Amino acid sequence: AINYLPKGGFFKLTCQAFEAGLAEESLFRFAMLGVLFYAWRNVKQRLPLALLTSSILFGFAHLINLGGQRADLTFYQIGVAFLLGLFLAVVYVYTGQLWLTMLMHFSLDWFSFLATGTTKLTGDLVPGDWWALLILFVIFGGFSVWMMFGTRRKVMERHVKRLTGEHQHFGYSIQY
C-alpha cells in the first residue's frame, strides 16, 4: 500500500507525472524534433543529428532542478534524461506515435515518483548509481546506434518525411 505519501500525494504525483509525459514529450519529441528535422532538411545525417541534439537539450532542460535538489544529483539526472530522451526520440521517430512516448514517459515518472514519494532526487549517489548510468548508456546508446542501420533507418527516414510534411498523402483527389 502507498501509505507513506502525504494526504493528496498520490493524486499530486500522478498529475506531475502526467504533466511531464504530456508536456516534455510534446516539446522535445514533437516540436523540437520537427523543427530540427525541418531546419536540417538538406543535411545528409539529419536523423542522428536531430536525435542527439534534441536529447542533449532534453537533458539540459533538467538543469532547472538545481533549484530544488543538490547539484550532483541534478547532473546525474541530466545524464539519465539525455539517455532516456535519446531512446524516446528513436521510439517516436520509428513508430511515428507520440502517444507511445508520452505513455512511456508518464509510466516511468509515475512509478519513480510513487516509489520515492517525491519528484526530486534525494539521498547520496553511490558507485552503483554510476554503474547503472553506464549500463543505460550501453543499452540506450547501443539500441539507438542499431536503429540507424538497415530497414529500421529507412522506416525512420520515411517517418521524418511524413512528420515534417515532406511526404504527405491525404488519400483523395479532385477530378473535373
Locate the predicted segments by residue.
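Membrane-interface helix/loop boundary segments of multi-pass membrane proteins
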Residues: A23-T53, R70, V90-Q97
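Functional transmembrane helices that form membrane-embedded active or gating regions
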Residues: P48, L52-S55, V93-S107, L163, ...
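Residue-level signature of the transmembrane alpha-helical core
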Residues: T14, F18, L22, L52-I56, ...
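C-terminal membrane module of polytopic membrane proteins
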Residues: F106-Y176
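Aromatic-anchored segments of alpha-helical transmembrane domains
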Residues: A1, S55-I64, F106-T118
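Helix-boundary and loop/linker segments of multi-pass membrane transporters
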Residues: I2-F11, W40-Q45
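Interfacial helix-loop-helix junctions of multi-pass membrane proteins
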Residues: F10, L63-G79
